[in-house]
Amino acid sequence: MIGKITSEMISRRWALSLLGAFGFVAAPTVPRPSNAEAQTAGAAPGRRKVALALQGGGSYGAFTWGVLDRLLDDATIDIVGVTGTSAGAMNGAVLVDGLVRGGPEQARAALRRYWEGVGAMPGFGSFFSNMSGEEAARTSLESIPAYVEAVKKNLSPYDLPASNDNPMRRLLTEIDFERLRLQDEIQLTVCATNARTARRRVFTNHDLSVDALLASACLPQLFRAVEIDGEPYWDGALTGNPAVAPLLTKMPGCDLIIVRVDPVNRPEAPRSVRDIYNRSVEISHNATFWLELGALAVVLRFVDEGRSPFGRVRFHVMEASSVMERFPMSSKLNNYPPLLEYLFNLGRQTGDAWIAQNGDALGRRSTMDLQQLLPGSIWNNI
């Protein structure tokens, strides 16, 4: 006899199928926790364990650096899992490497060295030399003749001489990848997009490498695809910004802090050719993330019935969208050191305010409803 198929069953099957496309492999369902367990799940006495989801966004990753610095400064918070894409992947790998090497202070120092290295790379710094970091953040690169000329040429990376001398590679050689592969204390996932098949590949502690990080941050309009195992890879944000489900599979019932740097809203519709292109990329990078969270939201509706493979995940978001949505989109490509320091301070202040207001919720409840996080059109269709 065929049992009754309800809309809830269809929704759950749809969501799990969609998550499968994102690289999620179904784990045994997690029983419904008691109220006491729900309040203390994943938290040792006196400690609050969190997982982090770090978005990509070029120089905006310095905002995430500031958030991480504040979290590392809190002796009651343990970071036990990280998923990141592009700049978020770089932040995540440097963070976890530092934690494994010597704890929070080592991680803070490693992140500062990394971002100081980013600021020391060639860029448009001479144009901004008389500006504060905030002024630079509000200034479009389109006001720089050299940038405009480069954009006008509209060259493919394959039109230029081949070079393996990516300056980011030198910064990443400080990471001890062998140590990362051997440790299981902190789960780390990074995603990249296969340029040939359009499928997402998720790298974990055990197969992470410099090439995997460069692939995750490989903007196809700027760099040639990074080849790994004979396949070409582009920016992971095309298929997951970041990839959430693979991490939650390993950490059911966790507190997940999403550090969001890509603005959802912009005060005005773009008009220039470059701004139109940049905004379309920004929207597409957010879309896969929203869709994945939407599928998670459907599955998590079944947690009270003991049928969610993720347990009772508690969601939190740290962002400064009201400030960052007013920055020109080209500022993501600006590595001017005072701008990076400004974003760092903005991130640290954001983290400090969030902890003061919401820190007590860790291990107990969500501070962000997915319905509020997702755009209405996404939520209404799940």
PLM region descriptions:
Residues 86:
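Catalytic nucleophile serine of serine hydrolases
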Residues 89:
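Catalytic nucleophile loop
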